[in-house]
């Protein structure tokens, strides 16, 4: 694990790199960059991140955040699916169907986040080199003939510093444990690659998953997609544009539909 100083330095470097790239692409991005630096890289924020990595504060803060988010999400799910929605939840290898994980379970997933990490790495799904690679997370003990539901994770990073490494590890570890196969992807970065390059890459990755995931034990007929920030935008757009030939150059007739999408900021 990297030291707090290394983590803070990395985040600052990423911010400056992003700012440099965006400013070269458009002078109008100056205000956005300054706002990002002030909001996400202010001294008090960096100090908090540094302290959290070397003290129990990280676990306490995470527990409080999980509890708050759980109340909001629970209310939304009850309003949509009814108060008994947990009884409708099924995971393929879940030993306690309908059971809602508590804060301790979430923290445990974070602690063991590498348990199923990237059992197959850097698979090429397109022509753009490293920008078109993906990793597959899965349990090594999946039953023979088993067809696991698939979750595609689209990383965030202002469409310019996105990387499949280091994002959503607790989520993918937990879903893998429940019997899912998770696929995390790289895609083209701005400003060297302008829109719609990003969404074309995401849809190309979906097409690859549909055509190949059965070889890894996945079910091509049940593919969900998620992502945060820029990844949330792209996962939403991908879910809403299945079969749009203008966003699928060279693979116009490929199946890029998904069965579910869960974007977040």
Positions of PLM-derived features:
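Primarily recognizes the serine-hydrolase "nucleophile elbow" in alpha/beta-hydrolase
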Residues: 204-265
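N-terminal membrane-anchoring alpha-helices
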Residues: 2-91
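Alpha/beta-hydrolase active-site loop signature
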Residues: 158, 187-191
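The conserved SAM/SAH-binding core of class I Rossmann-like methyltransferase domains
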Residues: 183-185, 264
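Short beta-strand element of the alpha/beta-hydrolase
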Residues: 145-157
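Short N-terminal helix/helix-N-cap motif within the alpha/beta-hydrolase-1
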Residues: 161-165, 192-193
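Short amphipathic alpha-helix adjacent to the substrate-entry channel of hydrolases
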Residues: 165-183
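N-terminal cap/lid segment of alpha/beta-hydrolase-fold proteins
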Residues: 24, 34-49, 85-146
